[in-house]
Amino acid sequence: MLKLKLDRHQWAGVLFALLCWCMPLVAQNENTTKPTHDSICLSEVVVSTRRQMMSANQIGSQINQTAITNAMGRSLGSLLEGVSGMSSVQTGTIVSKPVIHGMYGNRILLVSNGARLTGQQWGADHAPEVDKNSYSNIEVVKGADAVKYGSEALGGIVLMQPSPLPYDVSGLHGMASALYGTNGRRFGASGYVESSFKWLGNWAWRLHLNTENGGDRSTAHYLLNNTGMRENDLSLALGYSRDRWRLEAGYSLFTQKLGVMQSAQMGNEQLLQERIRLGRPVDFTPFSRQIDYPFQQINHHIAYLKAFYDHEKIGHFAFQSTFQQDNRRENRIRRLNHSDIPTVSLHLNSLQNSLVWNKGYQHWKSEAGAQLLITDNTNERGTGVVPIIPNYTEVAFGLYGLQKYTAD
Protein backbone atom coordinates (compact mmCIF):
# COMPACT_ATOMS: atom_id res chain seq x y z
CA MET A 1 0.00 0.00 0.00
CA LEU A 2 1.31 3.42 -1.03
CA LYS A 3 1.15 6.05 1.66
CA LEU A 4 1.72 9.74 0.98
CA LYS A 5 2.51 12.19 3.67
CA LEU A 6 1.94 15.74 2.41
CA ASP A 7 1.61 18.94 4.28
CA ARG A 8 -1.10 21.43 3.54
CA HIS A 9 0.99 23.42 1.05
CA GLN A 10 1.79 20.29 -0.96
CA TRP A 11 -1.89 19.25 -0.94
CA ALA A 12 -2.80 22.68 -2.28
CA GLY A 13 -0.34 22.27 -5.20
CA VAL A 14 -1.77 18.84 -6.09
CA LEU A 15 -5.33 20.14 -6.05
CA PHE A 16 -4.37 23.12 -8.26
CA ALA A 17 -2.72 20.79 -10.82
CA LEU A 18 -5.81 18.55 -10.95
CA LEU A 19 -8.02 21.60 -11.41
CA CYS A 20 -5.95 22.89 -14.35
CA TRP A 21 -6.04 19.44 -16.00
CA CYS A 22 -9.81 19.09 -15.69
CA MET A 23 -10.74 22.54 -17.02
CA PRO A 24 -9.97 21.75 -20.74
CA LEU A 25 -11.98 18.52 -20.45
CA VAL A 26 -14.95 20.41 -19.11
CA ALA A 27 -14.63 23.07 -21.80
CA GLN A 28 -14.34 20.43 -24.51
CA ASN A 29 -17.38 18.64 -23.16
CA GLU A 30 -19.34 21.88 -23.16
CA ASN A 31 -18.35 22.61 -26.80
CA THR A 32 -19.41 19.18 -27.99
CA THR A 33 -22.70 19.31 -26.21
CA LYS A 34 -23.51 22.86 -27.29
CA PRO A 35 -26.26 22.77 -29.92
CA THR A 36 -25.31 23.92 -33.41
CA HIS A 37 -27.49 25.67 -35.97
CA ASP A 38 -27.60 24.04 -39.41
CA SER A 39 -29.66 26.84 -40.94
CA ILE A 40 -30.19 30.53 -40.40
CA CYS A 41 -33.60 32.04 -40.96
CA LEU A 42 -33.61 35.38 -42.73
CA SER A 43 -36.31 37.79 -43.65
CA GLU A 44 -37.27 38.44 -47.27
CA VAL A 45 -34.29 38.54 -49.70
CA VAL A 46 -34.69 40.17 -53.12
CA VAL A 47 -32.18 39.45 -55.91
CA SER A 48 -32.60 41.70 -58.93
CA THR A 49 -30.80 42.04 -62.24
CA ARG A 50 -31.38 43.59 -65.62
CA ARG A 51 -32.05 41.37 -68.58
CA GLN A 52 -30.34 42.36 -71.80
CA MET A 53 -33.10 42.76 -74.35
CA MET A 54 -32.34 41.49 -77.83
CA SER A 55 -34.43 41.80 -80.92
CA ALA A 56 -36.05 38.67 -82.29
CA ASN A 57 -34.29 39.47 -85.58
CA GLN A 58 -30.85 39.61 -83.96
CA ILE A 59 -28.60 36.74 -82.94
CA GLY A 60 -25.45 37.89 -81.21
CA SER A 61 -22.44 36.54 -79.34
CA GLN A 62 -19.90 38.62 -77.45
CA ILE A 63 -16.23 38.09 -76.63
CA ASN A 64 -14.97 40.14 -73.69
CA GLN A 65 -11.54 41.61 -73.05
CA THR A 66 -10.42 38.70 -70.88
CA ALA A 67 -10.98 36.22 -73.70
CA ILE A 68 -9.24 38.55 -76.17
CA THR A 69 -6.20 38.87 -73.90
CA ASN A 70 -6.03 35.10 -73.37
CA ALA A 71 -6.02 34.63 -77.15
CA MET A 72 -2.90 36.74 -77.64
CA GLY A 73 -0.79 35.32 -80.45
CA ARG A 74 -3.80 33.86 -82.24
CA SER A 75 -5.49 35.37 -85.27
CA LEU A 76 -8.91 37.00 -85.28
CA GLY A 77 -10.36 34.10 -87.25
CA SER A 78 -9.02 31.60 -84.73
CA LEU A 79 -10.53 33.60 -81.84
CA LEU A 80 -13.97 33.72 -83.46
CA GLU A 81 -14.05 29.95 -83.96
CA GLY A 82 -15.42 29.69 -80.43
CA VAL A 83 -18.64 31.43 -81.50
CA SER A 84 -21.52 29.21 -82.58
CA GLY A 85 -21.87 29.07 -86.36
CA MET A 86 -18.39 30.44 -87.03
CA SER A 87 -15.27 28.84 -88.47
CA SER A 88 -12.22 30.07 -90.36
CA VAL A 89 -10.39 29.55 -93.63
CA GLN A 90 -6.66 29.23 -92.98
CA THR A 91 -3.96 29.63 -95.60
CA GLY A 92 -0.49 28.63 -94.54
CA THR A 93 0.50 28.96 -90.91
CA ILE A 94 -0.66 32.51 -90.18
CA VAL A 95 -3.39 33.80 -92.52
CA SER A 96 -6.90 33.09 -91.21
CA LYS A 97 -10.23 34.53 -92.40
CA PRO A 98 -13.44 34.38 -90.32
CA VAL A 99 -16.37 32.44 -91.78
CA ILE A 100 -20.02 32.87 -90.71
CA HIS A 101 -22.25 29.97 -91.80
CA GLY A 102 -20.06 29.28 -94.83
CA MET A 103 -19.76 32.93 -95.92
CA TYR A 104 -16.52 34.91 -95.77
CA GLY A 105 -14.65 37.69 -97.52
CA ASN A 106 -17.01 40.28 -98.97
CA ARG A 107 -20.04 38.32 -97.72
CA ILE A 108 -19.41 39.34 -94.12
CA LEU A 109 -18.68 42.78 -92.75
CA LEU A 110 -16.04 43.78 -90.22
CA VAL A 111 -16.78 47.00 -88.32
CA SER A 112 -13.81 48.52 -86.50
CA ASN A 113 -14.56 51.28 -84.00
CA GLY A 114 -17.79 52.26 -85.73
CA ALA A 115 -16.54 52.12 -89.34
CA ARG A 116 -16.54 49.26 -91.80
CA LEU A 117 -13.09 47.87 -92.48
CA THR A 118 -12.13 48.44 -96.12
CA GLY A 119 -9.37 46.17 -97.34
CA GLN A 120 -8.52 43.60 -99.98
CA GLN A 121 -10.79 40.85 -98.68
CA TRP A 122 -11.38 39.13 -102.04
CA GLY A 123 -8.45 36.72 -101.70
CA ALA A 124 -8.44 33.55 -99.60
CA ASP A 125 -4.93 34.45 -98.39
CA HIS A 126 -5.91 37.98 -97.30
CA ALA A 127 -6.53 38.16 -93.55
CA PRO A 128 -8.33 41.13 -91.92
CA GLU A 129 -5.98 44.07 -91.38
CA VAL A 130 -6.79 44.61 -87.70
CA ASP A 131 -5.08 44.28 -84.33
CA LYS A 132 -7.61 42.42 -82.21
CA ASN A 133 -5.65 43.21 -79.01
CA SER A 134 -6.69 46.88 -79.23
CA TYR A 135 -10.38 46.04 -78.68
CA SER A 136 -12.18 45.34 -75.42
CA ASN A 137 -15.30 43.81 -76.93
CA ILE A 138 -15.94 41.80 -80.11
CA GLU A 139 -19.52 40.96 -81.03
CA VAL A 140 -20.80 38.75 -83.83
CA VAL A 141 -24.26 39.79 -85.06
CA LYS A 142 -26.28 37.56 -87.36
CA GLY A 143 -29.82 38.06 -88.53
CA ALA A 144 -32.00 40.80 -90.00
CA ASP A 145 -30.51 43.54 -87.82
CA ALA A 146 -27.25 43.25 -89.76
CA VAL A 147 -28.93 44.68 -92.88
CA LYS A 148 -28.54 48.27 -91.64
CA TYR A 149 -24.78 47.95 -92.14
CA GLY A 150 -25.13 47.38 -95.87
CA SER A 151 -25.43 44.64 -98.46
CA GLU A 152 -22.03 43.20 -97.55
CA ALA A 153 -23.44 41.89 -94.27
CA LEU A 154 -25.30 38.95 -95.84
CA GLY A 155 -23.53 36.42 -93.63
CA GLY A 156 -23.29 38.68 -90.59
CA ILE A 157 -21.10 41.33 -89.07
CA VAL A 158 -18.21 41.36 -86.63
CA LEU A 159 -18.35 44.47 -84.41
CA MET A 160 -15.04 45.38 -82.78
CA GLN A 161 -15.11 48.16 -80.18
CA PRO A 162 -12.44 49.56 -77.84
CA SER A 163 -13.29 50.49 -74.28
CA PRO A 164 -14.63 54.04 -73.66
CA LEU A 165 -12.09 56.76 -72.99
CA PRO A 166 -11.47 57.40 -69.25
CA TYR A 167 -13.00 60.87 -68.87
CA ASP A 168 -13.77 60.45 -65.16
CA VAL A 169 -10.58 58.59 -64.18
CA SER A 170 -7.66 60.39 -62.57
CA GLY A 171 -4.10 59.15 -62.73
CA LEU A 172 -2.30 56.97 -65.26
CA HIS A 173 -3.66 53.49 -65.94
CA GLY A 174 -2.57 50.72 -68.25
CA MET A 175 -1.94 47.05 -68.85
CA ALA A 176 0.82 45.02 -70.51
CA SER A 177 1.04 41.40 -71.61
CA ALA A 178 3.64 39.27 -73.37
CA LEU A 179 3.80 35.92 -75.13
CA TYR A 180 6.29 33.34 -76.30
CA GLY A 181 5.53 30.43 -78.63
CA THR A 182 7.85 27.49 -79.16
CA ASN A 183 6.69 26.88 -82.73
CA GLY A 184 8.52 29.52 -84.72
CA ARG A 185 10.13 30.86 -81.52
CA ARG A 186 7.60 33.66 -81.56
CA PHE A 187 7.59 36.46 -79.05
CA GLY A 188 5.33 39.43 -78.71
CA ALA A 189 4.11 42.15 -76.40
CA SER A 190 0.98 44.26 -76.18
CA GLY A 191 -0.13 47.02 -73.85
CA TYR A 192 -1.83 50.34 -73.42
CA VAL A 193 -1.77 53.41 -71.21
CA GLU A 194 -4.62 55.86 -70.68
CA SER A 195 -5.42 58.88 -68.58
CA SER A 196 -7.34 62.15 -68.50
CA PHE A 197 -6.32 65.81 -68.43
CA LYS A 198 -8.36 67.07 -65.48
CA TRP A 199 -6.27 70.22 -65.21
CA LEU A 200 -7.05 71.09 -68.85
CA GLY A 201 -10.74 70.23 -68.80
CA ASN A 202 -12.58 67.00 -69.45
CA TRP A 203 -10.02 65.51 -71.86
CA ALA A 204 -9.02 61.83 -72.10
CA TRP A 205 -6.54 59.84 -74.16
CA ARG A 206 -5.30 56.31 -74.80
CA LEU A 207 -2.19 54.85 -76.48
CA HIS A 208 -2.00 51.19 -77.50
CA LEU A 209 1.05 49.36 -78.88
CA ASN A 210 1.45 45.81 -80.15
CA THR A 211 4.37 43.89 -81.65
CA GLU A 212 5.02 40.29 -82.66
CA ASN A 213 8.03 38.56 -84.21
CA GLY A 214 8.29 34.96 -85.36
CA GLY A 215 10.57 32.74 -87.40
CA ASP A 216 10.09 29.61 -89.47
CA ARG A 217 7.26 27.39 -88.32
CA SER A 218 7.70 23.64 -88.15
CA THR A 219 5.74 20.43 -88.34
CA ALA A 220 6.47 17.35 -86.26
CA HIS A 221 9.24 16.24 -88.64
CA TYR A 222 10.52 19.20 -90.68
CA LEU A 223 10.73 22.99 -90.93
CA LEU A 224 8.53 25.16 -93.09
CA ASN A 225 11.09 27.55 -94.48
CA ASN A 226 10.29 31.24 -95.00
CA THR A 227 7.16 31.23 -92.83
CA GLY A 228 8.22 33.98 -90.44
CA MET A 229 6.17 37.06 -89.64
CA ARG A 230 6.53 40.62 -88.39
CA GLU A 231 3.73 42.73 -87.01
CA ASN A 232 3.75 46.19 -85.45
CA ASP A 233 0.58 48.07 -84.54
CA LEU A 234 -0.23 51.43 -83.01
CA SER A 235 -3.43 53.22 -82.07
CA LEU A 236 -3.98 56.61 -80.46
CA ALA A 237 -7.28 58.14 -79.32
CA LEU A 238 -8.10 61.57 -77.90
CA GLY A 239 -11.47 62.78 -76.66
CA TYR A 240 -13.21 65.77 -75.11
CA SER A 241 -16.53 65.74 -73.25
CA ARG A 242 -18.61 68.67 -72.07
CA ASP A 243 -22.26 68.73 -71.10
CA ARG A 244 -24.20 67.15 -73.95
CA TRP A 245 -21.30 67.12 -76.42
CA ARG A 246 -18.52 64.62 -76.90
CA LEU A 247 -15.78 64.80 -79.54
CA GLU A 248 -13.26 62.05 -80.28
CA ALA A 249 -10.45 61.64 -82.80
CA GLY A 250 -7.98 58.86 -83.37
CA TYR A 251 -5.43 57.18 -85.60
CA SER A 252 -4.34 53.57 -85.96
CA LEU A 253 -1.61 51.84 -87.96
CA PHE A 254 -1.42 48.14 -88.79
CA THR A 255 1.78 46.84 -90.42
CA GLN A 256 2.47 43.20 -91.19
CA LYS A 257 4.97 41.21 -93.24
CA LEU A 258 4.31 37.52 -93.84
CA GLY A 259 6.65 35.02 -95.41
CA VAL A 260 5.21 32.49 -97.86
CA MET A 261 6.71 28.99 -97.83
CA GLN A 262 9.06 28.82 -100.80
CA SER A 263 8.17 25.24 -101.73
CA ALA A 264 4.50 26.30 -102.03
CA GLN A 265 5.28 28.34 -105.17
CA MET A 266 4.81 25.77 -107.92
CA GLY A 267 5.99 26.21 -111.48
CA ASN A 268 3.65 23.68 -113.08
CA GLU A 269 1.23 20.84 -112.37
CA GLN A 270 3.94 18.16 -112.46
CA LEU A 271 5.84 19.80 -109.60
CA LEU A 272 2.65 19.97 -107.57
CA GLN A 273 1.96 16.26 -108.11
CA GLU A 274 5.55 15.44 -107.15
CA ARG A 275 5.28 17.39 -103.87
CA ILE A 276 2.01 15.65 -103.04
CA ARG A 277 3.61 12.27 -103.67
CA LEU A 278 6.60 13.06 -101.44
CA GLY A 279 4.41 14.51 -98.69
CA ARG A 280 7.02 17.08 -97.71
CA PRO A 281 9.14 19.87 -99.22
CA VAL A 282 12.17 18.89 -101.28
CA ASP A 283 14.66 21.41 -99.88
CA PHE A 284 15.26 22.25 -96.22
CA THR A 285 17.31 25.00 -94.63
CA PRO A 286 18.08 25.67 -90.94
CA PHE A 287 15.75 27.77 -88.81
CA SER A 288 15.80 31.48 -89.62
CA ARG A 289 13.86 34.62 -88.77
CA GLN A 290 14.67 36.22 -92.09
CA ILE A 291 11.75 36.70 -94.48
CA ASP A 292 12.79 36.18 -98.10
CA TYR A 293 10.86 36.01 -101.35
CA PRO A 294 7.96 35.25 -101.68
CA PHE A 295 6.22 37.42 -99.06
CA GLN A 296 3.24 39.68 -98.40
CA GLN A 297 3.45 43.15 -96.88
CA ILE A 298 0.45 45.12 -95.64
CA ASN A 299 0.09 48.64 -94.26
CA HIS A 300 -3.34 49.83 -93.12
CA HIS A 301 -4.00 53.37 -91.86
CA ILE A 302 -7.20 54.56 -90.16
CA ALA A 303 -8.00 58.13 -89.10
CA TYR A 304 -11.39 59.07 -87.69
CA LEU A 305 -13.38 61.91 -86.16
CA LYS A 306 -16.53 61.41 -84.06
CA ALA A 307 -19.10 63.83 -82.66
CA PHE A 308 -21.91 62.93 -80.23
CA TYR A 309 -24.80 65.03 -78.98
CA ASP A 310 -27.34 63.93 -76.36
CA HIS A 311 -30.66 65.67 -75.76
CA GLU A 312 -33.45 64.44 -73.54
CA LYS A 313 -36.23 65.56 -75.87
CA ILE A 314 -34.93 65.18 -79.42
CA GLY A 315 -32.68 62.15 -78.86
CA HIS A 316 -29.09 61.09 -79.48
CA PHE A 317 -27.04 62.08 -82.56
CA ALA A 318 -23.77 60.49 -83.68
CA PHE A 319 -21.60 61.61 -86.61
CA GLN A 320 -18.46 59.83 -87.75
CA SER A 321 -16.02 60.45 -90.58
CA THR A 322 -13.35 57.81 -91.23
CA PHE A 323 -10.51 57.72 -93.75
CA GLN A 324 -8.71 54.46 -94.49
CA GLN A 325 -5.71 53.65 -96.66
CA ASP A 326 -4.80 50.04 -97.38
CA ASN A 327 -1.55 49.19 -99.17
CA ARG A 328 -0.93 45.56 -100.11
CA ARG A 329 2.25 44.32 -101.77
CA GLU A 330 2.93 40.73 -102.80
CA ASN A 331 6.31 39.59 -104.13
CA ARG A 332 7.13 36.23 -105.67
CA ILE A 333 10.31 34.55 -106.87
CA ARG A 334 10.78 35.87 -110.42
CA ARG A 335 13.37 35.33 -113.09
CA LEU A 336 16.18 37.70 -114.03
CA ASN A 337 16.44 39.04 -110.46
CA HIS A 338 13.04 40.72 -110.74
CA SER A 339 11.76 39.40 -107.42
CA ASP A 340 11.92 42.89 -105.94
CA ILE A 341 9.20 43.97 -108.40
CA PRO A 342 5.84 43.05 -106.86
CA THR A 343 3.38 40.90 -108.76
CA VAL A 344 0.50 42.53 -106.86
CA SER A 345 0.60 46.09 -105.54
CA LEU A 346 -2.79 47.52 -104.60
CA HIS A 347 -3.64 50.86 -103.00
CA LEU A 348 -7.16 51.22 -101.63
CA ASN A 349 -8.41 54.55 -100.22
CA SER A 350 -11.85 55.04 -98.69
CA LEU A 351 -13.80 57.80 -96.97
CA GLN A 352 -16.89 57.03 -94.87
CA ASN A 353 -19.34 59.56 -93.47
CA SER A 354 -22.24 58.42 -91.32
CA LEU A 355 -24.96 60.16 -89.32
CA VAL A 356 -27.19 58.25 -86.89
CA TRP A 357 -30.13 59.40 -84.77
CA ASN A 358 -31.95 57.34 -82.16
CA LYS A 359 -34.45 58.02 -79.39
CA GLY A 360 -36.16 55.80 -76.86
CA TYR A 361 -39.58 56.49 -75.35
CA GLN A 362 -41.70 54.17 -73.24
CA HIS A 363 -41.48 50.75 -74.91
CA TRP A 364 -40.40 52.09 -78.30
CA LYS A 365 -37.05 52.92 -79.82
CA SER A 366 -36.64 54.75 -83.12
CA GLU A 367 -33.43 54.85 -85.14
CA ALA A 368 -32.52 56.35 -88.51
CA GLY A 369 -29.23 56.83 -90.30
CA ALA A 370 -27.45 57.80 -93.49
CA GLN A 371 -24.05 56.80 -94.84
CA LEU A 372 -21.84 57.92 -97.70
CA LEU A 373 -18.94 55.70 -98.79
CA ILE A 374 -16.33 56.66 -101.41
CA THR A 375 -13.78 54.00 -102.40
CA ASP A 376 -10.87 54.29 -104.84
CA ASN A 377 -8.66 51.34 -105.83
CA THR A 378 -5.41 51.76 -107.78
CA ASN A 379 -2.89 49.22 -109.10
CA GLU A 380 0.79 50.05 -109.22
CA ARG A 381 2.12 50.21 -112.76
CA GLY A 382 5.16 48.36 -114.05
CA THR A 383 4.62 45.03 -112.28
CA GLY A 384 4.59 43.07 -115.53
CA VAL A 385 1.49 41.17 -114.39
CA VAL A 386 -2.11 41.76 -115.44
CA PRO A 387 -3.94 43.16 -112.35
CA ILE A 388 -6.41 40.80 -110.73
CA ILE A 389 -8.57 43.69 -109.49
CA PRO A 390 -8.94 46.63 -111.92
CA ASN A 391 -8.69 50.28 -111.03
CA TYR A 392 -12.08 51.58 -109.94
CA THR A 393 -13.89 54.30 -108.02
CA GLU A 394 -17.09 53.53 -106.14
CA VAL A 395 -19.58 55.90 -104.55
CA ALA A 396 -22.32 54.40 -102.37
CA PHE A 397 -25.06 56.17 -100.44
CA GLY A 398 -27.61 54.55 -98.16
CA LEU A 399 -30.46 55.31 -95.78
CA TYR A 400 -32.11 53.13 -93.18
CA GLY A 401 -34.76 53.33 -90.49
CA LEU A 402 -35.65 51.04 -87.59
CA GLN A 403 -38.59 50.95 -85.21
CA LYS A 404 -38.46 48.56 -82.25
CA TYR A 405 -40.90 47.66 -79.52
CA THR A 406 -39.71 46.05 -76.29
CA ALA A 407 -42.17 44.37 -73.96
CA ASP A 408 -41.73 44.22 -70.20
What are these regions (language model features)?
Residues K34-T36:
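Short linear regulatory motifs and low-complexity interaction segments
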Residues M1-T32, L42:
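Bacterial Sec-dependent N-terminal signal peptides
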Residues M86:
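Hydrophobic acceptor-binding patch used for acceptor engagement in glycosyltransferases
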Residues V83:
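Acidic-histidine catalytic/liganding microenvironments
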Residues L80:
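Active-site-adjacent helical/loop segments in soluble small-molecule enzymes
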Residues D38-C41, V46-A71, V89-G92, K97-P98, ...:
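Outer-membrane beta-barrel proteins, especially TonB-dependent receptors
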